[in-house]
Amino acid sequence: MGLEEQLPGGILLSTVEKVAGYVRKNSLWPATFGLACCAIEMMATAGPRFDIARFGMERFSATPRQADLMIVAGRVSQKMAPVLRQIYDQMAEPKWVLAMGVCASSGGMFNNYAIVQGVDHVVPVDIYLPGCPPRPEMLLHAILKLHEKIQEMPLGVNRERAIAEAEEAAMLARPTIEMRGLLR
């Protein structure tokens, strides 16, 4: 006999972290950072065929101060990188970043000095979405994966500890250029 059998109907048992995670995951407001062809697929996701509003993303935010998810869609040039970082810094906590497309994830086919070889060199990335360009269905799937991640994110001191551990693990990772085995 557990506690669940002793409670009357209509009682829900949970933790504050689980309830806060549920609320946060169902009210994401994305700030779009469309830089190339991936932005067209991102705009298609907001249309009636894919209906991103059913996942709590009623509108795309035009200002970073009202957004908590940044979708970086397309290649990021070296000149655009400081602007991307400034927009990320203006977003309120908690905030998440989704790198949409192979150009945002790893520089794509643009292996030259003018393109950032992965947006994770500028801002911390939570979800990487492959493809050139990825289909709207893939973006919806990535957002649902991000919902799962947000649901499990701890609060308060536990959140700060989890973020510090993730940053430390990211600093220990090999640079992207070494992992891809690029020609030099």
Curated annotation (Swiss-Prot):
The residues listed in the UniProt record as binding [4Fe-4S] cluster, with positions renumbered to this chain, are 37-38, 103, 132
What UniProt keywords are attached to this protein's entry? 4Fe-4S, Cell membrane, Iron, Iron-sulfur, Membrane, Metal-binding, NAD, Quinone, Translocase, Transport
* Entry-linked Pfam families: Oxidored_q6
The main enzyme category here is translocase
Tree of life domain: Bacteria
Q: Name one GO molecular function term.
A: NADH:ubiquinone reductase (non-electrogenic) activity
The record's section on InterPro entries has: NADH_UbQ_OxRdtase-like_20kDa, NADH_UQ_OxRdtase_20Kd_su
GO BP term, pick one: electron transport coupled proton transport
List the GO terms this entry assigns under cellular component, sorted alphabetically.
plasma membrane; respiratory chain complex I
Q: Which reaction does it catalyse?
A: a quinone + NADH + 5 H(+)(in) = a quinol + NAD(+) + 4 H(+)(out)
Q: How is the cofactor bound?
A: Binds 1 [4Fe-4S] cluster.
Q: How does it sit in the membrane?
A: Peripheral membrane protein
What cofactor does this one take? [4Fe-4S] cluster
UniProt xrefs under NCBIfam families: nuoB_fam, PRK06411.1
Summary of the function given for this chain in its UniProt record: NDH-1 shuttles electrons from NADH, via FMN and iron-sulfur (Fe-S) centers, to quinones in the respiratory chain. The immediate electron acceptor for the enzyme in this species is believed to be a menaquinone. Couples the redox reaction to proton translocation (for every two electrons transferred, four hydrogen ions are translocated across the cytoplasmic membrane), and thus conserves the redox energy in a proton gradient.
- Give the multimer and partner information: NDH-1 is composed of 14 different subunits. Subunits NuoB, C, D, E, F, and G constitute the peripheral sector of the complex.
HAMAP family linked: NDH1_NuoB
Per its record, how is this protein called by name?
Answer: NADH-quinone oxidoreductase subunit B
Name the gene for this chain. Answer: nuoB
